[in-house]
A protein has these predicted regions:
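Cysteine-dependent hydrolase recognition
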Residues: 1-181
């Protein structure tokens, strides 16, 4: 129902943008999450970043990138509305570029590329979320596209990735507005 063997839309998730604090009870769904890393030290650092962000209300920048990769840039159409909806909540920049570099204030980074360069030049704040909208970002090893682990290794606290072909349907990837709020 929520997966397709071919590139076709699937049933919408009732949990998307829902106010429920109890999805297992309300929707019979259990959101899947994992602590990912290639070593105990990486996972511990990830946990420590999460703890450091608790109740800190970090004042960072949200970067929403509109890229030249047409297959992975479908969220860009929602960026203007996201900026309007979250005005006064987060400092947000919509940039027409494939990647950012040399920024030390990254709280959110949404882009659409199979590989994101220059991650080593970025400073992710504790609690930062980063995502690159690919078919296989959730394949932690042996992927033909960048693994979501690269974000975590660069200092992000959270990322997202699929392990089966989602066919670039926007509902299969985090909505920046929902993820940030």
């Amino acid at each position: 129902k929520y997966c397709s063997k071919k590139c076709a839309p699937t049933a919408p998730s009732p949990y998307f943008n829902a106010p429920s604090q109890y999805p297992a009870t309300d929707y019979k769904l259990r959101p899947a999450m994992m602590l990912a890393g290639t070593s105990f030290e990486q996972v511990k650092a990830l946990i420590d970043r999460g703890i450091a962000s608790d109740h800190s209300f970090p004042k960072g920048q949200a970067y929403l990138l509109s890229t030249s990769d047409k297959a992975r840039n479908n969220r860009a159409t929602s960026y203007a509305q996201t900026a309007k909806d979250l005005a006064g909540v987060f400092s947000l920049q919509i940039l027409e570029t494939n990647f950012i570099s040399d920024r030390q204030d990254v709280l959110f980074y949404f882009t659409g590329l199979t590989e994101v360069p220059m991650l080593e030049t970025l400073g992710f704040l504790p609690g930062a979320l980063a995502d690159h909208l690919t078919s296989a970002g959730g394949m932690l090893t042996d992927s033909l596209q960048m693994s979501s682990l690269r974000w975590l290794e660069a200092g992000a606290t959270a990322s997202y990735g699929t392990v089966t072909e989602p066919c670039s349907f926007p509902q299969k990837f985090p909505s920046p507005a929902v993820a940030m709020f």
